[in-house]
Amino acid sequence: GAAAGGAAGGGAAAGGAAGGGAAAGGAGPDGVGPGCPVAVLLTAAEQLGTAGRTAELAVRYACEREQFGRPIGAFQAVQHLCADMRVRVEVARGAVYAAAVTGDPVDAAGAKLLADEAAVQGARDCLQVHGGMGFTWDADVHLHLKRAWVRAERWMTAAAAEETLAAHL
């Protein structure tokens, strides 16, 4: 969608110049504050992209890496990790797309909460599938995790999203 495409550039709209002011708790140069629904939604879309990519990386690695004479993806524990990653991605995708359609700040808060969980937990699970390889420069998994952590604290934290959602029950 348009929200995901705009966030994929990772540019100023999602937190470039205005992101510094918002991260410090104030408004950025364009008056964009930490709870700006557009910035929250674009960050959620960026997190959704990370979640999807780490799920793809985990599945691909699970199919390629062999242990005990068969791919590690043949082991049920690895299959469950990968399946859980895909479920979180699809749940977050629905929330991000819905928030993009409605433009509602409460929907954006819910989308950010779900996308943050999908990105951070997905990157952790991907790292687990990769094992020690995930922390080497040969794999980008550790970069996805670090960036997901940073974006989870940008524009709207989980606590702020939960407060926004609770206030509108």
Positions of predicted regions on the chain:
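Alpha-helical interface subdomain recognition
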Residues: 40-169
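FAD-binding core of flavoproteins
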Residues: 1-56, 60
